Curated annotation (Swiss-Prot):
It comes from Enterococcus faecalis (strain ATCC 700802 / V583). This is tRNA N6-adenosine threonylcarbamoyltransferase. Substrate binds at residues 141-145, 174, 187, 191, 280. It comes from the Bacteria. Pfam families: TsaD (PF00814). It is an enzyme of class 2 (transferase).
Amino acid sequence: MTIFTKERKLLLAVESSCDETSVAVIEDGDKILSNIVASQIKSHQRFGGVVPEVASRHHVEQVTICIEEALTEAKVTPEELSGVAVTYGPGLVGALLIGLSAAKAFAWAHQLPLIPVNHMAGHIYAARFVAPLEFPLMALLVSGGHTELVYMKEDGSFEIVGETRDDAAGEAYDKVGRVLGLPYPSGKEIDALAHEGTDTYQFPRAMLKEDNYDFSFSGLKSAFINTVHNAEQRGEALSTKDLAASFQASVVEVLVTKTIRACQEYPVKQLLIAGGVAANQGLREAMRHAISEQLPAVTLLIPPLKLCGDNAAMIGAAAFIEAEKNHFASYNLNAEPGVSFMTISEEG
């Protein structure tokens, strides 16, 4: 049974897992008609990170406006839609509930099916807007909350072959940025500084030679903090550019080395980089070089910058796959802030 019985295959998608309220209208799973993103970064900057209560309040204020703007920009009426997609996890529980409530209300009001989408699957399927996915593939998922290597044999099949044992890569960037006195979020600033500095400090590359695909960034974070604090105690001024370059060199080398190694062991046609840290130019450049040198037969897919961060377009792309597999939800669908990949295919 298919829900796509109307003239056009159109879905409304809602994303509210963290600090971006986003609503999109997607056609055919790979065409963005609108992708409205209401960012809250300025509200969280003074706290140096996302405050869940503040995030939830912003979602309440923005979600209805975003729905109206998404439909208007797409020139689509509710009657033309075939379903409503919504992120149900992972994320901040309060933030997720706002998006879920809005999506349920809209779906109920217009008698449309509700499609549950795993936020992390959404990041992977953002690559559908670049090119069709070819299986098997490997996805390096790097964000503020996750660092994972995910192997996919087919649509909707996710096998985590490696993950961080402590801090996520994006989390390490933000903590290092705080030490350097950079505004939140710090990833873009550190990336820019790194391109002007050199790897002077040779920070540790954790687990680089271990026979697995797991990551660890807590040791790097500690080494960085100790280097800065020790210099301060000696009254020594360190180069912010060199510190940023040294930190980024460590993160990127570990991510690239482990990813290439995983792609050499698992048969893959494509490598995807997804998540907020996929916007990092240093990582993009290093991965492109490594792929061309070591795995020329593998195609590298990286979403455009505007689709690396949280957005509803990626949720819509993933929702088309869920709909094809008849994965729909009732109005009892609840937020699952800690949901993993392994449960996505079990959604009924």
